[in-house]
Amino acid sequence: MYLEYLQPKLNLMDESSTISKNFPDYSPNLNTPITSNFNEETGSDCSLVTPRIISSSNSNSNSNSNSNSNSNSGSIDENELNNSNSSSSSARQIRKKWKEPEDIAFITTIMNNSQLLTFVEYFKPMKNFWKKISKILFQQYGYERNSRQCHDRFKVLYTKSLKVHPSKKSKQKKKKSKQEAGSNLNFDPSKLSRMQYLLVQLQNTFSFVNGNIILKSQKTLKPNKNGTNDNINNHYYNNCNNNNNNINNSNNSNNNNSNNINRNSNHSTNVFSTPEHIQSSINLDKLESLPALDTKGEPSFISPAQFSLLSSAPADNLILQTPPSPFFQQTMPIQLPRDAQQEQISPVFSTDVIYMWQTMFNTIENLKEQVNCLKNEVKQLNHKFYQQNKPLHNMSTSDSENFMQQH
C-alpha cells in the first residue's frame, strides 16, 4: 500500500526531469502540499497526478514586460548619450580656418619680431616665442590664436614657401631636367602676389629644423684683396690730412686767444669791472660741439699732484704745460706698415681701429685747449681777488696798530 502511494511520486519526478530538458523555461511547483485525495480505483492521488504548470500566456507577458523594460531603459540610455554628446560638441571649441589676411598678419608679426630668437628665454623653450607671437598678433591685429596654433600654422606656411620659390624647390628635388633648372633662373619676384612675396621673405629669413624655428645669419660680403686695400688706404690718408689741418687751425686759434688774454690783463685798471677776457676766451660753441666721452676708457692725463702744482704756479705763466707723454706728442696718426701680414688683417677692422684712435686724439687735443683756457681764467680771477683784498688787508693792519698804541 505504501509502495503504491510512492509510485506516482516517482513518475512525477521523472516527468519533471524530461520536461526540464525539453523546456528550459519550465519550473514545476514542488511546494504543493500532499493531500488525502486518494483514488482507490486507480490507486493514485489526483493532486499529485495533475501538477501545476505555469501558463504560456503568463510567461509571454513576463517576457514581453522584460523586453519592454529593457527597450525602455535602452532608449533612455540612448537619449542620455545623445544629449551628452550634443552638449560636449557644443562645448568643444571649433578651430577656425586661417584666411589670407590672417596669414599676412601672422607672417608680418613674425618678421617684425624675429630678433626675439636671439634671446635665450625665447629660444629655449620655443614655446615662449610662440606665446609672445600670439599675444602680439591679438594686440595688433585682433586675431586670437594660441601658441600651438601659431606653431602649426608656421609649419604649413613654411612648406608653402618651399613651393613658391623655385630655387628652393630645385634644391630639394635632386632629379630635375636641365630645362627646369634653366626656367628657374627666369624667376621674377615682381610678378608675385603679396602673400607669395611674404612667403619668400619667410623662407629667406628663417629655417625650420625638427620643429624649431631658427633665425638665419646675415651674410656679409667679403671685399676683394686687390682693389679694396688701395681704396681704403687712400681714404685713410685723406682723412689724416684733413684732421691735421683741423688741428693746426685749432692751435692757431688757441694762440690768438692767449694773446688776447695777455693784452686784457695788462690794460685792466678798474678792479671791480667785469673781466672781458673771460667772454673772449670761452668758446661756448666749441664746448657744445664736443662729443661725449667715456671717462672709463680715457686715460687720466692730469693727476691730482700735477693739478696742485699748476694751481700754485705764478700768474705770469698763463699757458698750461702738460707733462711729456708719447700719447700727446703724437701729431700724426699711426701709419701701419703694408706688408704680407697687413693683407691678412681684415681692412674693416683696421680702419675702425684707426678711426677710433684718431677721434680720441682729436677730442683730447680739444680738451687740452679748454683746460688751458679755464686755467687762465682761474689765474686771472685769483689775481683780481688778491688786488681787491689788498687794501682791505692794509686797512685792517693799520687799525690794529692804532688800537694797540692807544691802549
UniProtKB/Swiss-Prot annotation:
<keyword id="KW-0539">Nucleus</keyword>
<keyword id="KW-0238">DNA-binding</keyword>
<dbReference type="GO" id="GO:0045944">
    <property type="term" value="P:positive regulation of transcription by RNA polymerase II"/>
</dbReference>
<dbReference type="InterPro" id="IPR001005">
    <property type="entry name" value="SANT/Myb"/>
</dbReference>
<feature type="region of interest" description="Disordered">
    <location>
        <begin position="165"/>
        <end position="187"/>
    </location>
</feature>
<feature type="domain" description="Myb-like">
    <location>
        <begin position="90"/>
        <end position="158"/>
    </location>
</feature>
<feature type="compositionally biased region" description="Low complexity">
    <location>
        <begin position="241"/>
        <end position="270"/>
    </location>
</feature>
<dbReference type="GO" id="GO:0003677">
    <property type="term" value="F:DNA binding"/>
</dbReference>
<protein>
    <recommendedName>
        <fullName>Negative RAS protein regulator protein</fullName>
    </recommendedName>
</protein>
<feature type="compositionally biased region" description="Basic residues">
    <location>
        <begin position="165"/>
        <end position="177"/>
    </location>
</feature>
<dbReference type="GO" id="GO:0005634">
    <property type="term" value="C:nucleus"/>
</dbReference>
<dbReference type="GO" id="GO:0030695">
    <property type="term" value="F:GTPase regulator activity"/>
</dbReference>
<feature type="region of interest" description="Disordered">
    <location>
        <begin position="241"/>
        <end position="273"/>
    </location>
</feature>
<comment type="function">
    <text>Negative regulator of the Ras-cyclic AMP pathway. Negatively regulate the activity of normal but not mutationally activated Ras proteins. The down-regulatory effect of RPI1 requires the presence of one of the two Ras GTPase activators, IRA1 and IRA2.</text>
</comment>
<dbReference type="GO" id="GO:0009272">
    <property type="term" value="P:fungal-type cell wall biogenesis"/>
</dbReference>
<feature type="compositionally biased region" description="Low complexity">
    <location>
        <begin position="55"/>
        <end position="73"/>
    </location>
</feature>
<dbReference type="GO" id="GO:0007265">
    <property type="term" value="P:Ras protein signal transduction"/>
</dbReference>
<feature type="region of interest" description="Disordered">
    <location>
        <begin position="51"/>
        <end position="94"/>
    </location>
</feature>
